[in-house]
Regions:
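Bacterial N-terminal signal peptides
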Residues: 5-17
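Extracellular/lumen-exposed scaffold segments
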Residues: 22-268
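N-terminal secretory signal peptides that target proteins for export/translocation
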Residues: 1-2
Length: 268
């Protein structure tokens, strides 16, 4: 995928245009391969959080990426520092699929997708306006980084049923938390490999393991093997920080024919 042509024209990408906003959502921002907007549920909850989605409508034949694309690609990024009364925003990702399109292997979505996001208010009882700088890759045979600012006033239509339904459905589609019978166990590896044992229901041939390179980690595509009736994924560690972090962990998603789960694994 490194050989894909990259087309970047600043904040005005290709034939990009802004379509009118409605309800507690931003205007659609359109580019050659699709369009993107922010949708919110409107009202903040008691903890000062507003739920929303980054809604990505892809044209047929186009794709976008998971939190760690793989060989190449641009993961979705959301910067809310220009917002009013928004402290931060956390993106979540539905289970990706693994693809090999001849240019490289990548993890993501070749269909329209809504990425859930939680906005945290700086002051829970005060009004907020979201000004989100969005950066993501939408690719076909060329890869077009989409770069724009999406603005939402969540209180403009806080009881909009369509917006609330989209947000609710998108959060419901996220992988469930990993558990003992559907998750991974980290096995002994070495400085250059991450090895995990996968526990899951369903067909072993349909299972896949995705781990996100964060905190200066970079991973290759996993290989599969079997040991004592268990499916083993061995993931090359292509790069790593000089010192292993002691806080947090690496996001992973495990998929199977029966669904998907996600969790954090210790830094290798």
């Amino acid at each position: 995928m490194q050989s894909l042509k990259i087309l970047l024209l600043g904040t005005a990408i290709g034939s990009a245009a802004v379509l009118p906003a409605s309800a507690s959502s931003s205007a659609w921002y359109t580019s050659e391969g699709g369009k993107v907007r922010l949708v919110t549920s409107g009202k903040a909850d008691g903890a000062g959080r507003i739920r929303g989605v980054l809604d990505i409508a892809l044209k047929p034949g186009w794709k976008t990426y998971w939190r760690d694309p793989g060989d190449a690609g641009v993961p979705p990024q959301l910067d809310v520092s220009a917002s009013t009364n928004i402290a931060d925003a956390t993106l979540s990702f539905p289970a990706p699929q693994r693809h090999d399109d001849g240019y490289g292997k990548w993890a993501g979505y070749n269909y329209p997708v809504s990425l859930p996001v939680v906005f945290k208010l700086s002051a829970a009882k005060e009004l907020a306006v979201i000004d989100a700088d969005v950066f993501l890759g939408i690719c076909e045979t060329i890869c077009i980084p989409v770069q724009t600012r999406l603005t939402v006033d969540p209180g403009s239509d806080p009881d909009n049923a369509d917006d609330a339904a989209l947000v609710k459905a998108s959060f419901a589609a996220l992988p469930a938390p990993a558990r003992s019978d559907f998750g991974i166990n980290v096995l002994p590896g070495d400085h250059e490999t991450l090895v995990v044992e996968a526990n899951f229901p369903g067909d072993p041939d349909a299972a896949d393991f995705f781990v996100a390179g964060e905190r200066d980690y970079m991973f290759g595509a996993p290989s599969r093997s079997e040991k004592d009736g268990k499916l083993i994924f061995t993931v090359p560690i292509l790069d790593r920080p000089s010192a292993t972090p002691t806080d947090g962990g690496l996001h992973y998603t495990l998929t199977s024919s029966a669904g998907a789960v996600e969790g954090l694994l210790p830094f290798p």
